[in-house]
């Protein structure tokens, strides 16, 4: 019985993932990040308060701040490009 084809299966990850996460470590880190995002989404519906939920809420607020700063910077750059 040939068992070599048991390890041959199509990837469930999109091919573009190589650009974002070229190494196995980066892919695992990305998976961890996705799990945190899933937890954040779940946290929106619950009102449980514990040390872990406070930490997650603080991380979520930090991510929101970073994203808002990126958007703010993009708007400033777009306005400056119009003047050039």
From Swiss-Prot:
Transmembrane segments: none annotated. The keyword Magnesium does not apply. GO terms for cellular component: host cell nucleus. It comes from the Viruses. It is found in: Host nucleus. Keywords: Host nucleus, Viral genome packaging, Viral release from host cell. InterPro entries: Herpes_TT2 (IPR005208). One of its GO terms (biological process) is viral DNA genome packaging. Component of the molecular motor that translocates viral genomic DNA in empty capsid during DNA packaging. Forms a tripartite terminase complex together with TRM1 and TRM3 in the host cytoplasm. Once the complex reaches the host nucleus, it interacts with the capsid portal vertex. This portal forms a ring in which genomic DNA is translocated into the capsid. Associates with TRM1 and TRM3 to form the tripartite terminase complex. Belongs to the herpesviridae TRM2 protein family. This is Tripartite terminase subunit 2. It comes from Alcelaphine herpesvirus 1 (strain C500).
